[in-house]
Structures are given as structure tokens and as C-alpha cells.
């Protein structure tokens, strides 16, 4: 055992679950459920709580990044969905600020996309094109980049590129859970195993 004085880092098991959460997990483990219906119901409830268009519980923030990227590539086109990870005929680029590159962007690259690094608003506009599936923003690096969160959203709207904010470690205070959605990000992920204190 050790004392975690660093915070909710994944490699340090992020957070500890409450007894209420443990009791709910034990209760759930004793019942069969229709998973698709459960996912839909939970997503609808979370979306309502956050005033969001939709919500989804995934295997974790990294899983959400993979699923979100895939969704930006395929939309609702079943043919494209079934051909993944083959990106033939699909958008295959994701814009990202150079200062926002980090280990977990592998969850985006795992879909098969090419990360296109940019630094300025002008470069964003120049690089955004018909092959651009998404623009990834790493919330923890907000102060390191030349384009802040609001500017990233504005550029995404202006170029028609969906914006994704990885705010996995930034669930608290609770107002943040709807802040980035209200700001205009198309997709936002939070880690349930960090500030929300769910399973890691």
C-alpha cells in the first residue's frame, strides 16, 4: 500500500469507490439485464442530467475516445461501421495541437486515423479539409496550446469539423460535467474512475 498524494491518476488506480457504489455493483451482479436497453436507459438519464443531446457509458475515457473517433468517421453509415478499421473511402485525419499530444491519444489513433498536428488558428483552417474526421482537444493541456477551448470550438464550427474534448480528469467541480457541452464541444469524455469515483 502507498499514500496517493498526486491525485486521480489512472496509473495510481485513480480514485476509491464509495460503499454506495460497491453496494450497487453487488446488487447488479445478481441480476440479468438486457445490456442494450440498459445502455440506452443510462445514456438517456445522464444526457438529461447534463442537458446534453446524448450520453454513453463506455469502458473508460480511452474507450470513449476510440468510440467517439469511430463515430466521427462513420456517422450512421452501417457499411462504414462494419468496415472499420479499414478506412478506405472514409475521413481519416484528426487535427490536434502539437502541445496536446499525449500517451492516451493512442485511443484515437487505434481507429486507424492520422494525427495532423497544428499550432495556430490559421493552421487549423488550412489543414481542415474533406479528410478531417475530428479535432481532438486535451483539456489538461488547455494552457499549453495557442488555441484555448473556446477557440477550438469556434474553429470546429467554422470549418464543419466535430470537436472532441478529452476532459477525463476534469469532472470536478460537478458543473464541469455540462460546461464543455454548453461551450459547444460535440463530444466530451470524463473518466468515471477518477473524479466521479466509479470503477477504474
Where are these regions (language model features)?
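A short, well-structured juxtamembrane/interface segment
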Residues: 37-42
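Conserved PLP-enzyme active-site core in the AAT-like
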Residues: 1-12, 43-55, 62-200
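Glycine-rich phosphate-binding segment of PLP-dependent enzymes
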Residues: 2-36
Amino acid at each position: 500500500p502507498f499514500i496517493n498524494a498526486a491525485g486521480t491518476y489512472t496509473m495510481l488506480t485513480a480514485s476509491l469507490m464509495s460503499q454506495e457504489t460497491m453496494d450497487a455493483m453487488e446488487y447488479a451482479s445478481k441480476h440479468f439485464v438486457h445490456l442494450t436497453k440498459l445502455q440506452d436507459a443510462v445514456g438517456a438519464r445522464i444526457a438529461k442530467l447534463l442537458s446534453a443531446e446524448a450520453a454513453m457509458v463506455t469502458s473508460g475515457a480511452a474507450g470513449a475516445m476510440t468510440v467517439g473517433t469511430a463515430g466521427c468517421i462513420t456517422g450512421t453509415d452501417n457499411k462504414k461501421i462494419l468496415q472499420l478499421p479499414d478506412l478506405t473511402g472514409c475521413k481519416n485525419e484528426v487535427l490536434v495541437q502539437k502541445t496536446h499530444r499525449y500517451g492516451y491519444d493512442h485511443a484515437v489513433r487505434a481507429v486507424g486515423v492520422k494525427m495532423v498536428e497544428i499550432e495556430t488558428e490559421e493552421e487549423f483552417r488550412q489543414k481542415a479539409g474533406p479528410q478531417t474526421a475530428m479535432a481532438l482537444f486535451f483539456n489538461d493541456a488547455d494552457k499549453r496550446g495557442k488555441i484555448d477551448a473556446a477557440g477550438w470550438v469556434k474553429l470546429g464550427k467554422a470549418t464543419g469539423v466535430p470537436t472532441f474534448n478529452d476532459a477525463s480528469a476534469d469532472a470536478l467541480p460537478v458543473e464541469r460535467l455540462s460546461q464543455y457541452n454548453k461551450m459547444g464541444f460535440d463530444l466530451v469524455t470524463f473518466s468515471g474512475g477518477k473524479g466521479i469515483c466509479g470503477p477504474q
